[in-house]
Amino acid sequence: MGYTAQAQSLPRKVENVTIKDLYGNPVSLPYYGEKNLLIFYVDPDAYLAMNKNNKFAEELEANGRAAGPEIYGFGILNFPDTFLPKEFLRKICRKRVEKNGATIIDDGAHVFHDKWNLGNCNNKFMLLIVSKEGELVYILRDEITAAGKEEFYRIVDKYRK
């Protein structure tokens, strides 16, 4: 029997995985082992239908407090858990990529989810921080609170400069 991410302590070692880009081509996690990573692992239902952590994601984009020379942020779509049409979602994401240069990749078969043993990610808008040494050092699974924001900024500050 496997165990969920909630039951695992952090930091813990994670490996690079090969999943797909928005066109179905195989890709590895960008800059894995070269930079610290800020990963937005998103069930589209949580973002589009439930508005979970949307404001915080927009805040991060606007204030730049998670940006820096040592960190790279990108999104991974948790497609197996959504009820929304996949091709429609890919089209929306491709437009976002064209508009602002965002990196968004597709975990269409739960490869990332399973290899990193993330537990239940259905209806979640998760934030993960991975060190360039390949250690998962932070997971936000639920909607962020004021105290959670302080903790996130405290942790991300260590990895962005």
Model-derived features: where do they sit?
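N-terminal "domain-start" segment that seeds a small globular fold
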Residues: A7-V27, L48-K52
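Short active-site neighborhood of thiol/selenol oxidoreductases, capturing the structured segment around
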Residues: L29-N53
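Structural microenvironment flanking redox-active thiols in thiol-disulfide oxidoreductases
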Residues: Y47-V97, H113
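Thiol-/selenol-based redox modules, centered on thioredoxin-like
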Residues: N123-K161
